[in-house]
């Protein structure tokens, strides 16, 4: 059965959340938004392309930073309203220069920083 990006369930702004996960380690790297065209571009090129809500433009991950995400596999959740992108990540995934955007834990009511920026 051929996949059609239009078959996904997008929000009222035409967006769907996409969770990037390191394909080798399983580590969750980040969450960003995609629209149908970003999904199609990602599948066509193998370079993960998101939709930037602040810039209202396509955002090819790593285009300016060099921290490229190459798609290994795209998965659709059971409700078709969220994507899991298994990727090969070059360098840090987070704009703070950390491996993952999820570097802060809440432990005993306090925020704990789990990792420093990569050098």
UniProtKB/Swiss-Prot annotation:
Zn(2+) binds at residues 78, 94, 101. This is Phosphoribosyl-AMP cyclohydrolase. Pathway: Amino-acid biosynthesis; L-histidine biosynthesis; L-histidine from 5-phospho-alpha-D-ribose 1-diphosphate: step 3/9. Binds 1 Mg(2+) ion per subunit. The gene is hisI. Catalyzes the hydrolysis of the adenine ring of phosphoribosyl-AMP. Mg(2+) binds at residues 77, 79, 81. It comes from Dinoroseobacter shibae (strain DSM 16493 / NCIMB 14021 / DFL 12). Signal peptide: none annotated. Its cofactor is Mg(2+); Zn(2+). Its EC number is 3.5.4.19. Belongs to the PRA-CH family. One of its GO terms (cellular component) is cytoplasm. GO terms for biological process: L-histidine biosynthetic process. Keywords: Amino-acid biosynthesis, Cytoplasm, Histidine biosynthesis, Hydrolase, Magnesium, Metal-binding, Zinc.
